[in-house]
Curated annotation (Swiss-Prot):
One of its GO terms (molecular function) is structural constituent of ribosome. It is found in: Plastid, Chloroplast. It comes from the Eukaryota. Pfam families: Ribosomal_L32p. This is Large ribosomal subunit protein bL32c.
Length: 55
């Protein structure tokens, strides 16, 4: 089993954590932007099939 040899410093931990958070934030922002464009109908990259409901 792999075991780290030295303790990771607090500043390095913080740096790694911030990078990880930033990645998540940017992905969430892209997803939100895509959802917004789909809901308004301005999407150029997604084609949503419109289905007509007959009553």
């Amino acid at each position: 089993m792999a075991v780290p040899k030295k303790r990771t410093s607090t500043s390095k931990k913080r740096i790694h954590k911030n990078i990880w958070k930033r990645k998540g934030y940017s992905i969430a922002l892209k997803a939100f932007s895509l959802a917004k464009s789909l809901s308004t109908g301005n999407s150029k990259s997604f084609f949503v099939r419109q289905t007509k409901i007959n009553k």
